């Protein structure tokens, strides 16, 4: 993992705080000297549509191209959790396994550096 920078996050439930946190993350990511992976619980109650502008500005894409929900784990309906990746990274597999050890389902992703 020497050739990549990984950010793990758990963003605020409050929209305004979350937007401040995303702005700070954008500043960190825009200065990153290596390819970036950003993953965690984003608490985005509108799913990827809430993340759209941040992702475009930061040059990130979601590994979850099907928009599979991860919350709540027993009957997942919302996409609160993301694995985002930038240029120089290729996703080779992605899944959301049905593991009920948390209120969120896990995200599993394999990637390769290009």
Positions of PLM-derived features:
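Active-site regions of metal-assisted phosphoester/phosphodiester hydrolases
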Residues: 1-114
């Amino acid at each position: 993992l020497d050739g990549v920078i990984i950010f793990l996050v758990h963003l605020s439930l409050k929209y305004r705080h979350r937007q401040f946190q995303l702005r700070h993350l954008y500043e960190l990511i825009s200065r990153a000297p290596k390819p970036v992976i950003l993953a965690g619980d984003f608490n985005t109650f509108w799913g990827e549509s809430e993340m759209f502008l941040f992702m475009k500005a930061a040059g990130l894409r979601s590994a979850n191209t099907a928009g599979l929900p991860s919350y709540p784990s027993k009957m997942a309906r919302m996409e609160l959790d993301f694995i985002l990746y930038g240029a120089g990274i290729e996703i080779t597999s992605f899944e959301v396994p049905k593991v009920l050890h948390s209120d969120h389902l896990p995200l599993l992703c394999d990637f390769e550096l290009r």
